[in-house]
């Protein structure tokens, strides 16, 4: 029973550690004495502007959404454990590709 409970706890921890998300809200700006809400989101990684109700992928493997309430970004991949000497995420596809850093030709 202890082993079963430990496996459930481990599975829960593993499931919650698969990726990261963050959110940001808009701040109203004063223009001509009136509060004006922005109509674009600014990508925090490359400072590009994105229209409301749009979705984009960043060069840092995040998928971001620009909503009326603000923006949210989440990893496009689930995290797996880091193994020293191995690369686990391809920055172009944001997919897991484990291979030795000293021999990238041997991909798994």
Curated annotation (Swiss-Prot):
Task of the protein: May serve as a self-defense protein against the toxic effects of the snake venom during accidental envenomation. Does not show inhibitory activity towards brevilysin H6.
GO CC term, one of those recorded: extracellular region
Q: Any stretches that span the bilayer, and where are they?
A: none
Q: What protein does this entry describe? A: Small serum protein 5
The entry assigns this protein to a family as follows:
Belongs to the beta-microseminoprotein family.
Q: Which cysteines are joined by disulfide bonds?
A: 21-74, 41-66, 61-94, 64-73
Instruction: Please indicate if the UniProt record lists Ribosomal protein as a keyword.
Output: no
Q: Where in the cell is it found?
A: Secreted
Give the organism the record lists.
Answer: Protobothrops flavoviridis (Habu)
Q: Which UniProt keywords apply?
A: Disulfide bond, Secreted, Signal
Please list which residues make up the signal peptide.
Answer: 1-19
Q: Where does the source fall among the domains of life?
A: Eukaryota
Q: What is its main location?
A: secreted
Q: Name one Pfam family in it.
A: PSP94
């Amino acid at each position: 029973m202890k082993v079963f409970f430990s496996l459930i706890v481990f599975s829960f921890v593993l499931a919650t550690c698969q990726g990261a998300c963050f959110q940001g809200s808009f701040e109203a700006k004063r223009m001509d004495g009136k509060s004006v809400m922005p109509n674009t989101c600014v990508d925090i990684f490359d400072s590009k502007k994105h229209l409301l109700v749009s979705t984009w992928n960043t060069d840092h493997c995040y998928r971001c959404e620009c909503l009326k309430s603000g923006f949210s970004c989440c990893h496009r991949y689930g995290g797996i454990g880091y193994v020293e000497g191995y690369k686990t995420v391809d920055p172009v596809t944001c997919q897991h590709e484990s291979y030795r850093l000293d021999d990238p030709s041997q991909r798994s």
